[in-house]
Amino acid sequence: MLTGRKKAYLYEEHYDDVSGYSNPNESVHDHFTVGHTSTSVSLACGLAKARDLKGEEGNVIAVIGDGSLSGGEALEGLDYAAELGGNLIIVVNDNDMSIAENHGGLYKNLKFLRDTEGKADCNFFKSMGLDYVFVKDGNDIDALTFAFESVKDSKKPVVVHIVTEKGKGFALAE
């Protein structure tokens, strides 16, 4: 909805107007054609580096779901983001869902962070050198606005970990 695809989600006759993935032919906000979000953090690192080399300003934002975090490219992107420095916002959409069952140390840490409302001493993102903000209700627009206002001028990469409920507000999906 934030990238100009609102009609496709609100009106049945427009459902087929979008691919469901990043596509520059669908939105000026998409810079790459990709099929999975494990690539989002690495691609955002490249955009942030280019912005910095050109002496430009502005936010670069990567969005990645919890189900995509275990992808090798996602982990490489997080590692590089910590070294890159500069403004980079990494939104982790944690709805505790993925195509396959979430398991392993990373998902245990995400659960621990959810259970402690982001206050766990053992924080995967902080241990990598990234700043971290937790949003308990990622379906709450006011909470999201507050979180993004707090990080928009960050001078180093920050993870905004939002816990969402997939389909919230739409009875058939809840």
Describe each PLM feature range:
Residues E26-V28, A48, G67-L69, N95-M97, ...:
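Short, glycine-/Ser/Thr-/acidic-enriched flexible segments
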Residues V92, I99, N139-E174:
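Terminal amphipathic helices with adjacent charged low-complexity linkers/tails
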Residues D16-D17, K49-L53, E83-G86, M97, ...:
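Generic secondary-structure signature for well-ordered alpha-helical cores
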Residues S42, N59-A62, N87-V91, D131-V133, ...:
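Structural motif
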